């Protein structure tokens, strides 16, 4: 039984790194890790306030001895695993980046969570005890190296704890969508009073639940916030934002670090928008024609919405 384990949550970034003959770089978990002997992509936890692209460069260097540069986003995944010997269950939101080697040489490690870094062909990797997220990222059959909890524990998507300086801090993973319909309208939501960005138009979406995949979370949030049923078209990117003293309905400053995955979503059969989650962070939802969206003053859009709409070339 895993239901009595303490639930934890983290965000992590990993590297898909291949060489000139298409071998992939993997690292082995040491006896100090929760899954000794298993192999995974190099990477690790995103520090509070850290850009995940910096995380993947830092962690790859530490675990392999190689300096890498980020070429692009490969995938966004989520998984749960139980570690009964430590008394915990961990949900990890994993940002997987494609990287290229700038220099350095492979280095083994002692008394660290990983101990070896090696290059493998895909066929060789297939024979290894791979962490499930690594197998998924490489398009290989998933293994049973991880112990999966019996069921997801209760755990809030927003969870603030006292930081080392005494100020509450929260790191939150969320999924948002640039949503369009067959008439090329764009769906936006308005932020409720009392929340950061109150009164501004925002992308549909929000925090993912414990044990939930980001795509599934986004489709759920779309229904709750707008009453629309959508389908995922593609992954646009990931953004990281820190507000060192964010003010929300809690009524006190929070050192807030948000990591957001952005998707393109299409609603094939649009309906008049309705907000089912009354009293939450969304007070209104509306379809905008392209010209209406382009005419909105910049200060009427949240910063992340303006950036995402521009990236999707909708204005």
Predicted regions span which residues?
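Nudix hydrolase/Nudix homology domain
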Residues: 36, 106-170, 196-198, 272-315
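Short, well-ordered beta-strand micro-motif
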Residues: 17, 96-100, 121, 179, ...
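Active-site-adjacent beta-strand/loop module that shapes the phosphate/pyrophosphate-binding cleft
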Residues: 78-106, 239-273
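A short coil-to-beta-strand element that immediately follows conserved catalytic motifs
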Residues: 67-76, 229-238
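Acidic, metal-coordinating catalytic segment for phosphate/diphosphate chemistry
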Residues: 1-16, 142-178, 191, 253
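Conserved Nudix-box catalytic region and its N-terminal flanking loop in Nudix hydrolases
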Residues: 23-63, 185-228
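A generic structural micro-feature
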Residues: 7, 38, 87-93, 111-114, ...
